[in-house]
């Protein structure tokens, strides 16, 4: 029996882990046992517990409760906590997701004591080393035994860095080497699985009096925007003026901390500021919006999956396929660019090619892990 430890620390990682956990239970029961460790990097009822319940995955077996802190403090606490668990309990491998401090710390802790690391969403690059996430993903890829990249662009990024999808690049202590796998995207698996379910489980469109393709969904969470008063002001001003000029509602789920930073500026009555939403609620909003405006990588992708164009409120994106397809426009936190991007996307026919696999990435990932551990 293979024994795996899945390590998560933030809400998007719960969503990604749900796809693999579901397939493990449904198709690999009796062959693989999975335990879940939540680092507590981001943990409250809205951000985590609700998602476990909605996604139907087991509550974590471990929670490190590290909480917030500087990058160094948070990462160090997670390394220590993961190392303690991996030395007390035998695991054949560790699955990590994405690019958070939890991802980095888990990869460091596991690799130091020679437990194989399997990185889901490997190979993504923004080429912006000012982003903590860019540092995390680069280091994690170097330490991983299996690198599961969701797109051809991710594969090309890894090949440019010297990784090879066939030959082992380096050897670990157990004599096994690294392997890059073009797996497809587990979030696309989820989008196909949960789309119809969200229509049944959530009534947010009806409850808010919204109509199909007649509102904007905006999400803002990155510190580069939320901790920068000028950026935040530019984004809010652009949303306000778009709502007023185009007579369109803007749904804006905001963390209370970000809401406080808005100040007392007058906002158009069409700006609908609400509390952070559940998993099924965000799906329904993404599916029905005319345009999504976001600084979230995950929301960019989900909008694409559901055929909704996206204004990207960042200076770059890891998901370059979305921009190259014309389904997303990078506007950063620039007032004029946000206005122009919205008007360009709202008024044109947009195509959504199938860049992200066939909806069976999770099965491919698990099969590769089993082959690796034979």
Indicate where each model-derived feature is located.
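N-terminal beta-loop-helix "entrance" segment that forms/cooperates
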Residues: 40-58
């Amino acid at each position: 029996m293979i024994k795996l430890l899945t390590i998560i620390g933030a809400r998007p990682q719960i969503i990604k882990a749900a796809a693999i956990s579901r397939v493990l239970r449904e198709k690999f029961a009796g062959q693989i046992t999975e335990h879940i460790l939540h680092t507590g990097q981001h943990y409250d009822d809205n951000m985590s517990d609700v998602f476990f319940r909605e996604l139907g995955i087991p509550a974590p077996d471990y929670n490190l409760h590290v909480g917030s802190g500087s990058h160094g403090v948070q990462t160090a606490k997670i390394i220590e906590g993961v190392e303690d668990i991996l030395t007390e309990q035998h695991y054949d491998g560790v699955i990590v997701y994405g690019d958070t401090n939890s991802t980095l710390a888990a990869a460091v802790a596991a690799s130091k004591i020679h437990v194989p690391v399997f990185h889901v969403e490997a190979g993504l690059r923004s080429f912006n080393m000012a982003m903590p996430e860019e540092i995390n993903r680069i280091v994690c890829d170097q330490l991983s035994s299996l690198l599961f990249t969701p797109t051809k662009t991710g594969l090309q990024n890894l090949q440019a860095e010297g990784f090879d999808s066939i030959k082992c690049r380096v050897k670990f202590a157990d004599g096994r080497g690294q392997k890059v796998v073009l797996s497809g995207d587990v979030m696309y698996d989820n989008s196909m699985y949960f789309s119809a379910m969200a229509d049944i489980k959530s009534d947010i469109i009806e409850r808010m009096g919204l109509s199909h393709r007649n509102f904007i969904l905006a999400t803002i969470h990155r510190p580069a925007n939320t901790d920068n008063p000028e950026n935040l002001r530019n984004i809010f001003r652009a949303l306000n003026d778009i709502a007023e000029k185009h007579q369109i509602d803007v749904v804006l789920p905001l963390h209370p901390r970000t809401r406080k930073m808005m100040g007392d500026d007058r906002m158009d009555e069409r700006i609908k500021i609400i509390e952070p939403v559940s998993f099924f609620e965000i799906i329904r909003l993404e599916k029905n919006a005319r345009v999504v405006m976001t600084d979230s990588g995950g929301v960019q992708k989900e909008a694409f999956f559901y055929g909704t164009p996206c204004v990207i409120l960042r200076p770059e994106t890891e998901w370059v396929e979305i921009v190259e397809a014309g389904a997303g426009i990078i506007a950063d936190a620039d007032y004029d660019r946000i206005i122009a991007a919205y008007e360009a996307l709202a008024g044109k026919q947009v195509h959504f090619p199938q860049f992200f696999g066939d909806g069976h990435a999770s099965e491919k990932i698990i099969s590769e892990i089993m082959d690796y551990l034979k």
